[in-house]
From Swiss-Prot:
Coiled coil: none annotated. Monomer. It comes from Chromohalobacter salexigens (strain ATCC BAA-138 / DSM 3043 / CIP 106854 / NCIMB 13768 / 1H11). The lineage of its organism: Bacteria, Pseudomonadati, Pseudomonadota, Gammaproteobacteria, Oceanospirillales. This is S-adenosylmethionine:tRNA ribosyltransferase-isomerase. One of its GO terms (biological process) is tRNA wobble guanine modification. Transfers and isomerizes the ribose moiety from AdoMet to the 7-aminomethyl group of 7-deazaguanine (preQ1-tRNA) to give epoxyqueuosine (oQ-tRNA). Pathway: tRNA modification; tRNA-queuosine biosynthesis. InterPro entries: QueA, QueA_dom1, QueA_dom2, QueA_sf. It is found in: Cytoplasm. Belongs to the QueA family. Its EC number is 2.4.99.17. It catalyses: 7-aminomethyl-7-carbaguanosine(34) in tRNA + S-adenosyl-L-methionine = epoxyqueuosine(34) in tRNA + adenine + L-methionine + 2 H(+).
Length: 356
């Protein structure tokens, strides 16, 4: 299976650089799993697409203002993007500089924030932030929201709110679980009144989510690792949903990765509590265990996220839906429109299993 199989042409003007004025005011492309038919709807139509007894699973990670600009103490500009907090004062980060800083190098960022490079781990640098103030607090006060590279603009004050879900609570992500950005409080309340249940997992999205697949044969791709937690409460909610005949509906690909990781080694449809790192790579041929339906944004050509969606709803159907979305001028990527997909039971031309 080749990376080029997941290519599609996307005009630059279809990349959303700003969010819609209202979170839930966006388009929703619906793909029928049985017929492959495509319907063009609004996101608020979820009120009719979801049934009482269904379970929506959200990722409650909170995006850190993880980008800082500054310089080395010896001179020379440097840009930092935190990848993962290690403790209250240390973190793993990407550094962009004309010359990679060595261990012992002091960095001075905006707001007189000082950090020292303690070690290098492949492409990541281990930083220790100086002083008594915790690293996360320093970033909240002086950091910039880490907008994806394809948004191609500086972050603005409004991004502090809009590049964050309304239910975000556990700090640790450096990219938003973007399918959840469409849910506002009125829509969530209306769904609850309809009898739709809601549960939460946590996956701290790393900057690796934007790394391209560099190999031609996607089976040779090594997926980046991200930390997640699926707790006992969510496991009980999934079991109860199965018992009443409802659907487990993942809000975003990060929720999919949580649920499918927690389902490894379990009977079909069941999950167990899980806390730790996952590098699960889902592409066509994957044997689904837990997720019945998916709400997701439109993803980059040749990306692992597009491969996951193709595994879920069928490669030919998804690629045809993407071509239709381009023709109908849907907005793409993090601040763009969304899709609603049911899991396809049909076979597809790529029978190989994925690996975890």
């Amino acid at each position: 299976m080749q990376r080029a199989d997941f290519h599609f042409d996307l005009p630059d003007e279809l990349i959303a650089r700003y969010p819609s004025e209202t979170r839930s005011d966006c388009r929703l492309l619906c793909l029928d799993d049985a017929t492959g038919d495509i319907a063009h709807r609004r996101f608020t139509d979820l009120l009719t697409l979801l049934a009482p007894g269904d379970l929506l699973v959200f990722n409650d990670t909170r995006v850190i203002p993880a980008r800082l600009f500054g310089q080395k103490a010896s001179g020379g500009r440097v840009e930092m993007l935190l990848e993962r907090p290690l403790d209250a004062h240390r973190g793993l980060a990407h550094l962009r500089a004309s010359k990679a800083p060595r261990p012992g190098t002091e960095l001075i960022f905006e707001g007189d924030v000082h950090a020292v490079v303690e070690a290098r781990h492949d492409a990541l640098f281990e930083l220790r932030f100086l002083g008594e103030t915790p690293m996360i607090e320093l970033l909240e006060n002086h950091g910039h929201m880490p907008l994806p590279p394809y948004i191609d603009r500086e972050d603005e004050l409004d991004d502090r709110e809009r590049y964050q879900t309304v239910y975000a609570r556990r700090e640790g992500a450096v990219a938003a679980p973007t399918a959840g950005l469409h849910f506002d409080t009125p829509l969530m309340e209306a769904l609850r009144e309809r009898g739709v249940e809601m549960g939460y997992v946590t996956l701290h999205v790393g900057a690796g989510t934007f790394q391209p697949v560099r190999v031609d044969d996607i089976r040779e791709h090594h997926m980046h690792s991200e930390w997640l937690e699926v707790d006992e409460t969510l496991c009980r909610q999934v079991e109860a949903t199965r018992a009443r005949g409802g659907r487990v509906i993942a809000v975003g690909t990060t929720s999919v990765r949580c649920l499918e990781t927690a389902s490894q080694g379990q009977e079909d449809g069941h999950i167990a509590p899980f806390r730790g790192d996952t590098d699960i790579f889902i592409y066509p041929g994957y044997q689904w265990r837990c997720v019945d339906a998916l709400i997701t944004n439109f993803h980059l050509p040749e990306s692992t996220l597009l491969m996951l969606v193709s595994a879920f709803a069928g490669y030919p159907q998804v690629m045809r839906a993407y071509r239709a979305a381009v023709a109908e001028r849907y907005a793409f990527f993090s601040y763009g429109d969304a899709m609603f997909l049911n899991r396809s039971a049909s076979s597809h031309p790529f029978p190989e299993n994925s690996h975890a």
